UniProtKB/Swiss-Prot annotation:
Residue ranges annotated for the Helicase C-terminal domain, each copy included: 440-601
Name of a matching Pfam family: Helicase_C
Family annotation (PROSITE patterns): DEAD_ATP_HELICASE, HELICASE_ATP_BIND_1, HELICASE_CTER, KH_TYPE_1, Q_MOTIF
Gene3D superfamilies named among the record's database cross-references: K Homology domain, type 1, P-loop containing nucleotide triphosphate hydrolases
Gene for this chain: DDX53
Span of domain Helicase ATP-binding: 253-428
Protein's UniProt name: Probable ATP-dependent RNA helicase DDX53
EC number: 3.6.4.13
Amino acid sequence: MSHWAPEWKRAEANPRDLGASWDVRGSRGSGWSGPFGHQGPRAAGSREPPLCFKIKNNMVGVVIGYSGSKIKDLQHSTNTKIQIINGESEAKVRIFGNREMKAKAKAAIETLIRKQESYNSESSVDNAASQTPIGRNLGRNDIVGEAEPLSNWDRIRAAVVECEKRKWADLPPVKKNFYIESKATSCMSEMQVINWRKENFNITCDDLKSGEKRLIPKPTCRFKDAFQQYPDLLKSIIRVGIVKPTPIQSQAWPIILQGIDLIVVAQTGTGKTLSYLMPGFIHLDSQPISREQRNGPGMLVLTPTRELALHVEAECSKYSYKGLKSICIYGGRNRNGQIEDISKGVDIIIATPGRLNDLQMNNSVNLRSITYLVIDEADKMLDMEFEPQIRKILLDVRPDRQTVMTSATWPDTVRQLALSYLKDPMIVYVGNLNLVAVNTVKQNIIVTTEKEKRALTQEFVENMSPNDKVIMFVSQKHIADDLSSDFNIQGISAESLHGNSEQSDQERAVEDFKSGNIKILITTDIVSRGLDLNDVTHVYNYDFPRNIDVYVHRVGYIGRTGKTGTSVTLITQRDSKMAGELIKILDRANQSVPEDLVVMAEQYKLNQQKRHRETRSRKPGQRRKEFYFLS
């Protein structure tokens, strides 16, 4: 019986059983599975028969690794599922997935085995005879150290690189550079470019490529400067009625049109969507092969929420460039209907990671033809823990694609994501990469208690003017529903919007808010990203968010494209850990800081220092004293 992982419970072989098998996929299904364990393994391409071959029983541990580490890494890197079933002298290996990934996993396993066999042949026979056999005739207290063979990682890496080359060898080349600088743009002096960027929200650009830096393209201040070679796109822009590009669009377009990967860091409402969509249209229509020959979508836009996905799809439909077809894929809609829509042929897929990953794993969508990738609102993606799904999705997207990433903030986690998925990118950001709330918004901070929140909110609502439109942020769904009910009972028009709301109810609430039928929209952060609301006068933070990035994003709903407005934020003792960060944000935006907030921040700092001293003075192993009072 197998003995490579002693920390798992062993099972005796039963002639009636199919055999013990190692069956791991990510963090689920790990451990032993027999005939009553995992039924019907699933993986990408699981409709295809598994790739089966045999290995010697003494090589099973080499493939599994300590605590299953190697087999888990293999499955993660190849997007496959691997089963190993013990036999009398040989173990049967079954690999589930698509054809390329199965071959890649088999090649990696064979490399591991060759490396181990080479190591064994070089080992001394005397040394081998003197060692206690692992897993045999051991007492309960026996401890045996197993020599870890030297890994020939260069050979493994070379095998993986070769497999990757074979995987993408049949795909046509990608054309990326379509930019021709206009005469007006080329005539801009260096000082004019510097002044333009400073006057337009202090836009900053940088080249993140290592080594010799490239020249940052000059901004295209007019639509015709960016798209003079594409009259059909200019006609669509004129038809929609946009007068001039936003600053972020002016700077992003010449970079993307040159085929350079780009990171855009800017708040919601700065025109990020069109900054990547319009170059994407040109990219799709200008590839060496026709759309019919492409055999799949050419552009993929990943968004964290269905609201943002619907907004992006609406923008695609609005400009309708050369008949490009787009589809929106997200959870909550009919899955079979989405599969049917994809099968009819699409050029652009706008999707949330969860639903797209589901369709990908069941071979319902072909992503090999994607040459233009957008990761929209990357910071929100990470907040919602979508990174594992993103990694799996990108296993099936060609590595020589062009990639654009947008984010409202620039924390270390987003930087790491950018390093993983973008190649030699440039970055364009508004203002400073440190968190800064827009200075066109008057930020009012009220230090209060949980009990006083309702009364303060009621007072605020009663003092609203007829033209005011308020987004009210809360932390929980039931609070949104309770507040909405209370306001409507009083004859105050309000709607709640959260993750449990039906899609039709969400769309109706947003439309009612835009049209002015309701004046107060009460929402949670999870659905707020992607809401296309341009005439908000007030943001009311009933509950303070979990991190300061979200606060900046909330306030940004008012300050879109330089508009002015007011935010009101209630902060209580339970939010005291955020007080110091909030003060920094207020200082950077030249806002007044309430004395109560300063006191809260100082008190929290003192409490933390006291707790730290107590922890350091405590003896090792000594627990903090607990006191219990009996009534």
